[in-house]
Amino acid sequence: MFDLLCITDRALVREPFLDRLAAVAAARPRAIVLREKDLPQDQYQALAAQALEICRQAGVPCVLHTFVGAARALGARAIHLPLPVLRTLSAGERAAFPALGASCHSVEEAWEAVALGATYLTAGHVFATTCKAGLPGRGVEFLAQVCAAVPCPVYAIGGVGPENLPALAQAGAKGGCVRSPLMTCPDPGAYLRQWKEAAAHVL
């Protein structure tokens, strides 16, 4: 299956954020990445504790983001880090997370992240996206180069949707990351069904 990672952004959500999170978790993406890095660490930790419980009840992995201290305090097993943050961790700190993701924007960054212990990568942004307004996407060829360069799973990010799964899968990606649609769509379950239907035709 071509996996979907949900990337959260509470600023886009109209209803209470935890209600949206529960609805997305019930739709069963491969994982939910709690990317609320504008929060102070104490507020992030409080939110993450609730998110971890919601995801646990739904049977969906919850990946914390950026805040290593909060993740360790909560006993989280998975974290996703910007490369500059990953660079600051000791080997012992990295070993605390069996699932350690990193964001990369070049083949060189992908190599470095893997050397620092990353178990999966996100690569992007592949297509134009509202998150990177005004910047052209790096393209599917960039994604293919990253996928070919590293031994770990690579997830495409940036403008990803069911309509471009064939190109992403052909490039070698394990899955894709979705932010805005899952934060704003009327029915996360329907979106996941659309994704899975598209994935079934490309693999």
Predicted regions and their residues:
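Active-site mouth loops of central-metabolism enzymes
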Residues: 1-18, 98-104
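Short, well-ordered coil/turn segments that N-cap beta-strands
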Residues: 1-4, 28-30, 58-60, 75-77, ...
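Glycine-rich phosphate-binding active-site loops on the catalytic face of alpha/beta enzymes
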Residues: 6, 82-92, 122-134, 165-198
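Short secondary-structure boundary segments
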Residues: 10, 36, 83-84, 104-107, ...
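Alpha/beta enzyme core
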Residues: 16-31, 74, 84, 107-124, ...
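Conserved beta-strand positions in the central sheet of alpha/beta enzyme cores
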Residues: 33, 63-64, 80, 101, ...
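Alpha-helix-loop-beta-strand connector modules within alpha/beta enzyme cores
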Residues: 45-64, 83-86, 91-106, 134-162, ...
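Catalytic cores of alpha/beta
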Residues: 62-77, 105-117, 149-150, 154-156, ...
